[in-house]
Regions:
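Hydrophobic, small-residue-rich membrane helices and short re-entrant helix-turn-helix hairpins
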Residues: 78-84, 196-204
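Residue-level hotspots within the lipid-embedded alpha helices of multi-pass solute transporters
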Residues: 56-59, 127-131, 176-183, 188, ...
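Alpha-helical transmembrane segments and terminal signal-anchor/GPI-anchor hydrophobic tails
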Residues: 173, 181-183, 198-274, 278-308
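Hydrophobic/aromatic residues in alpha-helical transmembrane segments
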Residues: 66-69, 186-189, 244, 248
Length: 318
């Protein structure tokens, strides 16, 4: 076996690990916008305009995480210990943060204790809850995939994406949306790309990226400035957001495989970073203390934003 094959077999593809890192950075950026108070700040403020347009990458990144899972797990057996490890990691960070907070705060809060003891059941972090539910379902999803031919698989995806993405993006059938169901659909798309090696998608990827990026930017500005429900749904299942995430994912899997131990080391901490910074106790503390609104009109705003992101990325290594 040559060195390149050994790297592919024994080490994770650093293209995908780099994509994971970029995704968690995008999610932190999204949370900095979503959980901060920007009342009375308008799009005339350039920093705010850029943050408003870029933060949507957080929602897109959630889809990319699931696409990656579908791409790599479709041909694997999900072992019970992997599911248990995922659940225990979620519980560990929840317990640890609760204990530290209670000690520092000097008093016991019953609601915090209850929510911390059962983070998955109380949906303290919707992404982690949905991801764990998806992971539990993967063995059964993979059985379905194995028993479908390409035509059946394609038809199933067409129906699912139409019902749960295209129509809701136009303000139709929103009441039937479920993030868990959407994660299953996105997983199926990632698995489809892996199973059938969609070369035609690779060839059209640049066009998809440009079209979806421009379309999404126009939609966001129109929605904000004129308060028009042109695209009523700006959730993870928004069709244009899904296409943009898909094109980013395809770009990274289409690159030449390489290995970098530093990228892979940082990437291995992504789940922990997500669990810590978006913990229901930590979340309000971070975005209240950083007070981004006070810096939004400063020329060094983005340096401040980058500093916050770097600090959050380093939390797991403290």
């Amino acid at each position: 076996m040559n060195l390149n094959k050994k790297i592919q077999k024994n080490n994770r593809n650093s293209n995908i690990e780099l994509l994971r890192i970029l995704c968690i950075i995008s999610i932190i950026l999204h949370h900095s916008y979503y959980h901060s108070d920007f009342s009375n700040v308008t799009l005339e403020n350039f920093n705010y305009l850029m943050l408003y347009l870029i933060e949507i990458l957080g929602n897109i990144s959630n889809n990319i995480f699931v696409l990656i899972t579908g791409y790599y797990v479709v041909n694997s057996k999900v072992k019970l210990r992997n599911i248990i490890k995922l659940v225990l990691e979620s519980i560990f960070y929840s317990y640890a943060i609760m204990i530290i907070y209670t000690i520092i705060n000097g008093k016991v809060d019953a609601n915090i204790i209850i929510n911390s003891l059962t983070p998955i059941m109380h949906n303290s972090n919707w992404f982690i809850t949905c991801y764990i539910l998806l992971y539990i379902s993967i063995p059964f999803i993979n059985i379905l995939i194995q028993n479908l031919n390409k035509k059946q698989y394609s038809y199933m995806l067409f129906i699912a994406i139409t019902i749960f993405s295209i129509l809701p993006s136009l303000g139709l059938l929103n009441q039937y949306f479920s993030r868990y169901i959407w994660f299953i659909i996105v997983y199926l798309v990632g698995a489809y790309i892996k199973k059938y090696d969609c070369k035609e998608l690779y060839l059209k990827n640049d066009l998809l990226f440009v079209f979806s990026s421009i379309s999404l930017a126009i939609i966001l500005i129109v929605k904000k400035v004129w308060n028009v429900g042109l695209i009523i749904n700006i959730d993870n299942n928004n069709f244009i957001m899904f296409i943009l995430g898909l094109s980013i994912f395809v770009e990274f899997i289409n690159r030449k495989i390489f290995y970098n131990k530093y990228i892979n080391y940082i990437s291995s901490s992504v789940l922990g970073i997500y669990l810590i910074h978006d913990n229901f106790i930590i979340r309000p503390i971070i975005w209240r203390k950083t007070n981004l609104k006070a810096y939004i009109d400063k020329p060094y705003f983005w340096l401040y934003e980058i500093l916050i992101i770097l600090i959050i990325l380093s939390l797991i290594h403290i």
